[in-house]
Amino acid sequence: MLDIQLLRKDLDGVAKRLADRGYPLDVAAFSALEAERRAIQTRTEELQARRNSLSKQIGAMKGRGEDTSAVMAEVGGIGDEMKASAVKLDEIQARLSELMLEMPNVPHESVPVGRDETENVEVRRWGAPRQFDFDVKDHVDVGTPLGLDFETGAKLSGARFTVLRGPIARLHRALAQFMLDTHTQQHGYSETYTPYIVNPDVLYGTGQLPKFAEDMFRVEKGGAENTVTQYLISTSEISLTNTVRDSIIEASALPIKLTAHSPCFRSEAGSYGRDTRGMIRQHQFDKVEMVQIVAPEASYAALDEMVGHAEAILQKLELPYRVVALCTGDMGFSAAKTFDLEVWLPAQNTYREISSCSNTESFQARRMQARFRNAQGKPELVHTLNGSGLAVGRTLVAVLENYQNADGSVTVPVALRPYMGGVERIDAPSSAA
């Protein structure tokens, strides 16, 4: 959530910056609510002052033995008006809160202005795409003989679900373990296991609600009546970041660096017809997430660090990739600045997103009331960052395509072999040695 004081001080400036990311701020609605709020608060202050004056007058009159009934009646009327004003003020504050919850974060000044992904800016590339001397297959054709089973996934759960078997399942598990070990042993993150089902207020905290309810899977407790609807997490960013909600952290405890491996559940409501083949866009997929909770002055250095941590995974796997700075029109709702990592997929002859690393500044912290005690001993909002480290399914796709061989086998990246019992390549069961 944005700082309402920022809007009060520079409403037109905020509106312009939000317009850069495609959000039309309703300046008239905000201004009208603010004017009404100020009028009620001013009137309430006047009434309070009048009531205080009358209370003193009543005391003096009683001391002189005078009749105070008329003055007391006026005080009673003032009390009634103040109660009505308080109710009206609560209504206005609620409407302001609703308006604020719909507003995305303000882009950082360094974010390139653009309408959509076509105007993102490439920052750098790493690695050269492999030159194949045979016809390249996509991950579906490579993986199906090795245990990638879309037919059974569809039979069990419908479209955009997959069953992994045998060597493919083992490779998928190896990737997740390798990512976790790298982040915990080399990058300083603390491995964390959190619930996959969360309450609505948790999703308000990280910005998925109220705007993106249609992208979530809702769950209800069987056999229970009048229960609160809960949600399956779309990323473990949600649960990891909310571990610091409603808390004041000592400055000495910062930065807090957390990582988790979890399934992620997304309805993909706005993705009809996109990436319908294979594992690129699934309703359920695994991801290793990185989250950092930091002091405000450290957040952009932390963003660069986090991007480097995601890059390290791709470099160890020797997968070519590029880093892209997202433009204003392509950033996520809560982000002030985002870098995407895109991995090379030879069958598509292009780079595809495999990680997104974002600094939300104080946007999520304000919603969560996550604070730290600053040098002056006063509570101050932390900055929160999140990044994929990496999406496990898409990394599996990249390994299958980049490490495929002409005979249908797949070479196991050197970094993964300790997690595969020393296996150097995987073959279809029918042709395995």
UniProtKB/Swiss-Prot annotation:
Q: Which pathway does UniProt place it in?
A: Aminoacyl-tRNA biosynthesis; selenocysteinyl-tRNA(Sec) biosynthesis; L-seryl-tRNA(Sec) from L-serine and tRNA(Sec): step 1/1
What is the name listed in the Swiss-Prot or TrEMBL entry for this protein?
A: Serine--tRNA ligase
- Record's Gene Ontology CC terms? cytoplasm
- Oligomer and partners: Homodimer. The tRNA molecule binds across the dimer.
Q: Name one GO biological process term.
A: selenocysteine biosynthetic process
Pfam name, any one: Seryl_tRNA_N
Q: Where in the cell is it found?
A: Cytoplasm
Protein residues bound to ATP: 266-268, 353-356
- Domain of life, per lineage: Bacteria
What is the UniProt domain comment for this protein? Consists of two distinct domains, a catalytic core and a N-terminal extension that is involved in tRNA binding.
**Protein residues bound to L-serine:** 235-237, 289, 388
The record's function comment reads:
Catalyzes the attachment of serine to tRNA(Ser). Is also able to aminoacylate tRNA(Sec) with serine, to form the misacylated tRNA L-seryl-tRNA(Sec), which will be further converted into selenocysteinyl-tRNA(Sec).
Q: Its family?
A: Belongs to the class-II aminoacyl-tRNA synthetase family. Type-1 seryl-tRNA synthetase subfamily.
Q: Which PANTHER family does the annotation name?
A: SERINE--TRNA LIGASE (PTHR43697:SF1), SERYL-TRNA SYNTHETASE (PTHR43697)
Gene for this chain: serS
Q: Which GO terms describe its molecular function?
A: ATP binding; serine-tRNA ligase activity
Which E.C. number(s) belong to this protein? 6.1.1.11
Q: Which reaction does it catalyse?
A: tRNA(Ser) + L-serine + ATP = L-seryl-tRNA(Ser) + AMP + diphosphate + H(+); tRNA(Sec) + L-serine + ATP = L-seryl-tRNA(Sec) + AMP + diphosphate + H(+)
Query: Which controlled-vocabulary keywords does the entry list?
Result: Aminoacyl-tRNA synthetase, ATP-binding, Cytoplasm, Ligase, Nucleotide-binding, Protein biosynthesis
Would the keyword NAD be found if you checked this record's keyword annotation?
Answer: no
